[in-house]
């Protein structure tokens, strides 16, 4: 058996090449209710945060916030959009949860809906 080493080369021209814009919309992966827990390897779980399912589409330093139904909520959460837009990348499409984090570390949907006196609003991203 031969030992084969694979190498990926990246040149400056590769990195600075024009990119196709990220998609306008990606259908979110939603949880599915089941009567039995799946068995076997390859299954994972995640914390259920109490918030709004949100996509963030980043292009040239600006982020758009999109609900799970595709509504643009950028104007509702401009600080979150600005923070996500400051991520050092050329472009990205994030899928996550917009949450109001309480001082005890839990999330509160009611506090998020009030939006005025929320101790901390943040977006957890589950996939890119």
Regions found by a protein language model. Give the residues of each.
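Catalytic cores of nucleic-acid ligases and guanylyltransferases
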Residues: 1-128
